[in-house]
Structure formats: structure tokens, C-alpha cells
């Protein structure tokens, strides 16, 4: 069964959006295979966003993602990677359609509420970064 990594970012946790976001995924029929509330360390943030290391926004991205607790999860279901991306909406809130998570809740490109794996390969890498095998149910 296909799995993807999803993270509700500090702005989503701070604004009390965790329950609503989880409910949307459950209503779609996705199974939660793992879930935890956590603070991301500087090292984990840098590893997670390694592809952006040379970009000018990298320090701000790491600073933001380590600024408060996040909810990390693994969702499972047919076509889950692509479907979660669709449910999240465009990265920039101004481009995100109403009815998508970012369209409904994101305020800026920096505080866009949620992260989801872009590909199956990214999902496998990100799941391994955030969860030990025994944490996956």
C-alpha cells in the first residue's frame, strides 16, 4: 500500500488546525499509519530540507520549521502521494484553490500550514527521517 509523509507545520499547530486537517484526510479514506507531535531539531530540519541548502530562503525555512511543535504523520492509501498534494493545494496561498488546505488556511508562502511528500521516493526518504520502522503501524 502506498504511503506518504505529511507534516502540519508550526503555524498550523499554533492556530489549532490539526483536528480539521486530520479529519479531511480521514474523510478521504486514508489510514494514519503513524503520527506524533514533536519539535524538529536544527539537524533534522537541515536534513529534511537539504535540497534547498544553497537557496537564499534556507535559513528562514529552517528557523520557521524549528520555531514550534509540528505534527508529523504517515498516511496510507491508494494514490495517497498525489491525492494529498492535491488536497494541500498550491505552495503559495494566493495560488491555492478554495477547498484545499492551503487555500482555506495558509496565510503566506512562509506560513503555508502543511508539507507533503512530492513523490513516492521523497515519501520513503522523509518517512525514514522522521519515523523508526517500529513506529509505523
Swiss-Prot record:
Is the keyword Plastid assigned to this protein?
no
**E.C. number:** 2.7.4.6
List the InterPro entries: NDK-like_dom, NDK-like_dom_sf, Nucleoside_diP_kinase
| Major enzyme class | transferase
Question: Principal localization?
Answer: cytoplasm
Name of the protein this chain belongs to: Nucleoside diphosphate kinase
Which family does the similarity line name? Belongs to the NDK family.
- Annotated keywords: ATP-binding, Cytoplasm, Kinase, Magnesium, Metal-binding, Nucleotide metabolism, Nucleotide-binding, Phosphoprotein, Transferase
Give the multimer and partner information: Homotetramer.
GO terms for biological process, alphabetical: CTP biosynthetic process; GTP biosynthetic process; UTP biosynthetic process
Which residues does the entry assign to the active site, renumbered to this chain?
A: 115
Give me the residues that bind ATP, please.
9, 57, 85, 91, 102, 112
This protein's cofactor list reads:
Mg(2+)
Which residue ranges traverse the bilayer?
Answer: none
Catalysis: reaction(s): a 2'-deoxyribonucleoside 5'-diphosphate + ATP = a 2'-deoxyribonucleoside 5'-triphosphate + ADP; a ribonucleoside 5'-diphosphate + ATP = a ribonucleoside 5'-triphosphate + ADP
Q: Does the keyword Transferase apply?
A: yes
Looking up SMART domains in the UniProt record yields:
NDK (SM00562)
The record's section on HAMAP family has:
NDP_kinase
What does this protein do, in the record's words?
Answer: Major role in the synthesis of nucleoside triphosphates other than ATP. The ATP gamma phosphate is transferred to the NDP beta phosphate via a ping-pong mechanism, using a phosphorylated active-site intermediate.
Q: Which GO terms describe its cellular component?
A: cytoplasm
Q: Which NCBIfam families match?
A: PRK00668.1
| GO terms assigned for molecular function | ATP binding; metal ion binding; nucleoside diphosphate kinase activity
The record's subcellular locations are:
Cytoplasm
Amino acid at each position: 500500500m502506498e504511503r506518504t509523509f505529511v507534516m502540519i507545520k508550526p503555524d498550523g499547530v499554533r492556530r489549532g488546525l490539526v483536528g480539521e486537517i486530520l479529519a479531511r484526510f480521514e474523510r478521504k479514506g486514508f489510514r494514519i499509519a503513524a503520527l506524533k507531535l514533536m519539535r524538529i531539531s536544527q539537524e533534522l530540519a537541515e536534513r529534511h530540507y537539504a535540497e534547498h541548502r544553497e537557496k537564499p530562503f534556507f535559513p528562514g525555512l529552517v528557523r520557521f520549521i524549528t520555531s514550534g511543535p509540528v505534527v508529523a504523520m504517515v498516511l496510507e492509501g491508494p494514490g495517497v502521494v498525489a491525492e494529498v498534494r492535491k488536497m494541500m493545494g498550491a505552495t503559495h496561498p494566493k495560488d491555492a484553490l478554495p477547498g484545499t488546505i492551503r487555500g482555506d488556511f495558509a496565510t503566506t508562502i512562509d506560513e503555508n500550514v502543511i508539507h507533503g511528500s512530492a513523490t513516492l521516493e521523497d515519501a520513503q526518504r522523509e518517512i525514514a527521517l522522521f519515523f523508526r520502522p517500529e513506529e509505523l503501524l
